């Protein structure tokens, strides 16, 4: 029921799929579930998760459930490891118990840390510099091990700076509180938000400041569907 997950639900519905939304609604929004079946449960509570999902059958799991604020992760590392890593371990435990065998993980380019090349590929070293990035890499490792030990397949998508809204304006990003770069930059430029600090002045650009890429959230949602179709 978060930003990227809700747009992925929308994309699934457009292709005729039925969905079940699993969320504890600590940051997600009920209005974003778009009338789909909802299971409200905390991934950190393995017992409650087992009870809520006992006997369920799903063709695949899209895993978006993770805390994602870099600064907060460095202040509260235990919270991020408990939520992101323990939560993923519990989800995979229940998946194996119920016979689900496909997962697409919402990972992050933060697993790379400070890049040593302009273009990031699969072989680029993974050296996250934030606790958030470390927990996402640990989530990837859990999936990798699960795939090695069980008849299970997974894809991890490493992205950053999702932006935009549904093309028909029916769905978009919740901005209270605002935590994402692009809306923050737009508000700063419009004079309706706090000034934005830009770090670095020696990049190979006209004014020496860095250039940030982004991906539209609808393209990102469709990428998740393509990844799941690949696993099928």
List the predicted regions and their residue ranges:
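N-terminal Rossmann-like NAD(P)+-binding domain of SDR-like oxidoreductases, especially those catalyzing
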Residues: 1-165
């Amino acid at each position: 029921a978060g930003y990227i997950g809700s747009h992925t639900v929308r994309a699934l519905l457009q292709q005729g799929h039925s969905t079940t939304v699993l969320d504890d609604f600590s940051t997600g929004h009920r209005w974003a579930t778009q009338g789909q079946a909802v299971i409200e449960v905390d991934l950190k509570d393995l017992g409650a998760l087992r009870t809520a999902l006992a006997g369920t059958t799903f063709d695949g799991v899209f895993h978006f459930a993770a805390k994602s604020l870099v600064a907060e992760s460095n202040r509260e590392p235990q919270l991020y490891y408990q939520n992101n890593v323990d939560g993923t371990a519990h989800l995979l435990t229940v998946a194996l118990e119920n016979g689900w065998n496909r997962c697409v993980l919402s990972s992050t380019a933060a697993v790379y840390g400070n890049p040593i090349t302009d273009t990031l590929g699969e072989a680029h070293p993974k050296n996250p510099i934030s606790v958030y990035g470390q927990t996402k890499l640990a989530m990837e490792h859990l999936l990798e091990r699960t795939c090695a030990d069980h008849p299970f397949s997974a894809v991890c998508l490493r992205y950053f700076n999702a932006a935009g809204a549904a093309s028909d304006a029916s769905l978009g990003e919740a901005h209270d509180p605002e935590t994402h770069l692009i809306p923050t930059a737009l508000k700063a430029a419009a004079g309706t938000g706090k000034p934005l600090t830009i770090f670095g002045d020696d990049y190979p650009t006209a004014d020496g400041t860095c250039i940030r890429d982004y991906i539209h959230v609808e393209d990102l949602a469709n990428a998740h569907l393509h990844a799941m179709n690949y696993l099928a």
